[in-house]
Design a protein with these regions (language model features):
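A glycine-rich phosphate-binding loop feature that marks nucleotide/adenosyl-phosphate handling sites
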Residues: 277-281
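Acidic catalytic motifs of isoprenoid enzymes
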Residues: 16-206, 213, 217-240, 244-253, ...
Length: 299
């Protein structure tokens, strides 16, 4: 289901939860207590900028695909390519009371386009798995824009389509090889992160690949109780999360360390502190919360 909600004074578009339980979005975000106020305000500006790019190009159907994950990509591309920044203060339907800082670069438009492609292929995957009315409507709603974007970004679109199809086939085979499953999502994000085919493309691919693997593993671990209850696919089915905790933590550390090593090779000119906060702290927000909950259960 897609919905918009207010969290305190901030707008949060709740990530669409796939019928099979794996939205695989929402993990790549800041850890607010460890971020300087000026950096937090900057991050919010980029988040709002992406939201406005989605709305201006695609309307509400674009705006509801907004994720924190793509905000990281906008920051990364804007920093490495030293993109021109357009900063404004605007009102919006979510924040009608006052104007909000909105920071936009060319990378926001790219991320908005990729968000639409990802949304379309997630609906296609849902339709394959569940044959639900919601998925069918989603495919119809996003198909037209997707066709145009496939022409504009053939490499990225092909990687997303092939990655989702490989993932679907492995799930149909009841594959329990987490690394093989995560590889599918990693390959998708690798091509998404490589905006341009230049001398930096391989470093972007490496960052996206390992971050994608981290996201898949984290998502499977978080969704295990719900997937078990609803008898949905999950590579960790049949194992208690408390027993899995050390193994999953080691897997996640391996992937995020590799993502961080690739990220540090990129010549980031600005926003480095924000991105390091995300990569080395924020991505662990949900895992740390689950870990605390499991520890409380044992007491």
């Amino acid at each position: 289901e897609i919905c918009a909600c207010l969290v305190g004074s901030e707008m949060c578009i709740r990530d669409r939860k796939r019928e099979d339980g794996s939205s695989m979005f929402g993990y790549v975000r800041i850890r607010k207590p460890e971020l300087l106020v000026k950096d937090y305000e900057c991050y919010k500006g980029f988040y709002c900028g992406l939201c406005h790019s989605l709305r201006d190009t695609y309307g509400l159907r674009g705006q509801v695909t907004l994720t924190y994950d793509m905000t990281f990509l906008v920051l990364l591309l804007s920093s490495v390519y030293d993109l021109a920044v357009k900063e404004e203060h605007k009102r919006c339907i979510i924040h009608p009371a006052g104007k909000r800082r909105v920071i936009r670069t060319e990378a926001a438009d790219y991320a908005a386009d990729i968000n639409m492609l990802l949304s379309y292929y997630h609906f296609v995957d849902d339709k394959q798995d569940e044959h639900s009315l919601a998925a069918s409507l989603g495919v119809q709603m996003y198909r037209g824009q997707s066709r145009r974007l496939e022409q504009h970004y053939p490499r990225q679109a092909r990687a997303i389509a092939e990655g989702m199809q490989r993932l679907h086939l492995l799930e149909q085979e009841d594959c329990r090889n987490v690394s093989a499953l995560a590889d599918c999502f990693g390959r998708m994000l690798a091509e998404v992160f490589a905006w341009k085919e230049d001398g930096l493309a391989d470093f972007f691919r490496e960052t996206g690949y390992y971050l994608g693997k981290f996201i898949y593993i984290m998502d499977a671990f978080e969704d295990l109780p719900e997937d078990t209850h609803k008898e949905r696919f999950n590579p960790y089915l049949g194992t208690d999360r408390r027993e899995l905790l050390p193994q999953v933590e080691e897997q996640l550390l391996t992937e995020i360390a590799a993502a961080g090593a690739a990220f540090e090779k990129l010549p980031c000119l600005e926003y480095r502190d924000i991105m390091r906060n995300i990569l080395y702290a924020g991505v662990w927000n949900r895992f740390d919360r689950i870990k605390q909950e499991l520890q409380k259960e044992e007491q």
